[in-house]
C-alpha cells in the first residue's frame, strides 16, 4: 500500500521517517496510547481502517490486536497543524495498552485534577 502523495507531502517525519500517532477512543474521548507510524503504516490504516503502527524496537509494522485480539477500528484520522502528528479516533476492543490496561495512561497520575 502506498500513501497518497498529497498526504505524504504534508507529513513532517522525524529522522527515522516516522510521525507520532495519538490514539483517542471515540466514545469516551480517552487518550488510549501514543505510537509511531511510517508512511506504509499510515497508508494501510487509511485503506483498511485497522490501526497499523510501526514498532521502533522490532523495525516493522504491526496491526493493533493482530495477536492479542485487542483491536482498534479507525473512525477518523486527522493531521495536526505542524504535520508531525496524526490523531486516530478509534473504537477499542479490549485493552489498548500492552499491559492489558484500557489506556496506556491509566497507571501513573502525576498531577490530579483540582476539585
Curated annotation (Swiss-Prot):
The lineage of its organism: Bacteria, Bacillati, Actinomycetota, Actinomycetes, Mycobacteriales. Pathway: Amino-acid biosynthesis; L-histidine biosynthesis; L-histidine from 5-phospho-alpha-D-ribose 1-diphosphate: step 3/9. Homodimer. InterPro entries: PRA-CH, PRib_AMP_CycHydrolase_dom, PRib_AMP_CycHydrolase_sf. Its EC number is 3.5.4.19. Zn(2+) binds at residues 81, 97, 104. It catalyses: 1-(5-phospho-beta-D-ribosyl)-5'-AMP + H2O = 1-(5-phospho-beta-D-ribosyl)-5-[(5-phospho-beta-D-ribosylamino)methylideneamino]imidazole-4-carboxamide. It comes from Mycolicibacterium paratuberculosis (strain ATCC BAA-968 / K-10) (Mycobacterium paratuberculosis). It holds the Pfam family PRA-CH. HAMAP family: HisI. Gene3D superfamilies: Phosphoribosyl-AMP cyclohydrolase. Belongs to the PRA-CH family. One of its GO terms (cellular component) is cytoplasm. Its main location: cytoplasm. Binds 1 Mg(2+) ion per subunit. Binds 1 zinc ion per subunit. Keywords: Amino-acid biosynthesis, Cytoplasm, Histidine biosynthesis, Hydrolase, Magnesium, Metal-binding, Zinc. Mg(2+) binds at residues 80, 82, 84. Catalyzes the hydrolysis of the adenine ring of phosphoribosyl-AMP. One of its GO terms (biological process) is L-histidine biosynthetic process. This is Phosphoribosyl-AMP cyclohydrolase. It is found in: Cytoplasm. GO terms for molecular function: magnesium ion binding; phosphoribosyl-AMP cyclohydrolase activity; zinc ion binding.
